């Protein structure tokens, strides 16, 4: 199996403060090992190390209409939740296109997602259909595999996310975990 550390995605909201990105991605890799991921059975890699992620993202962004992006429900909600940041960038708006590239690059036929990610997968399917219509059948149209687990709640009651700064790192002290 493969596990991608999506470090390019972090640039969509942390583009101004990138000094911690390198250490964050290394910490995440160590956390994966500490949580029991066996590197002999699972290949994990950094998204930014595979240049084709960025290349396919660029190609897909050329054929994805802006209204498709602005109608993604998560977009408006995320802007409201992160209103203290300037998210008036293509990087943030185009986050779902980068996600589509992550899926389509590997020609995934099924994708495990939570309910909150269904709109992104629907957009991925639209982008794949448009690409296939323009250039021939290149990408399969991926189907979702819905996870049975509910959203993991962060320290502030919202969905746990590094973007919201509400995570409990695996290497936290017992006092921090208890809080």
Label the model's feature ranges.
Residues 1-101:
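N-terminal Rossmann-like or analogous alpha/beta NTP/dinucleotide-binding catalytic cores
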Residues 76-179:
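Active-site cores that bind ATP or allylic diphosphates and position pyrophosphate for catalysis
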């Amino acid at each position: 199996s493969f596990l991608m550390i999506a470090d390019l995605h972090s640039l969509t909201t942390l583009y101004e403060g990138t000094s911690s990105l390198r250490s964050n991605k290394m910490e995440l890799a160590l956390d994966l090992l500490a949580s029991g991921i066996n590197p002999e059975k699972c290949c994990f890699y950094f998204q930014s190390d595979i240049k084709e992620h960025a290349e396919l993202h660029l190609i897909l962004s050329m054929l994805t209409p802006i209204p498709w992006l602005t109608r993604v429900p998560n977009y408006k909600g995320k802007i409201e939740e992160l209103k203290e940041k300037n998210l008036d960038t293509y990087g943030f708006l185009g986050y779902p296109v980068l996600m589509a590239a992550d899926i389509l690059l590997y020609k995934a036929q099924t994708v495990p997602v939570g309910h909150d990610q269904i709109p992104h997968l629907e957009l991925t399917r639209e982008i794949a259909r448009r690409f296939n219509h323009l250039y021939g059948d290149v990408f399969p149209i991926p189907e979702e595999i819905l996870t049975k687990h509910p959203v993991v709640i962060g320290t502030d009651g919202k969905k746990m996310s590094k973007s919201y700064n509400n995570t409990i790192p695996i290497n936290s002290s017992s006092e921090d975990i208890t809080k």
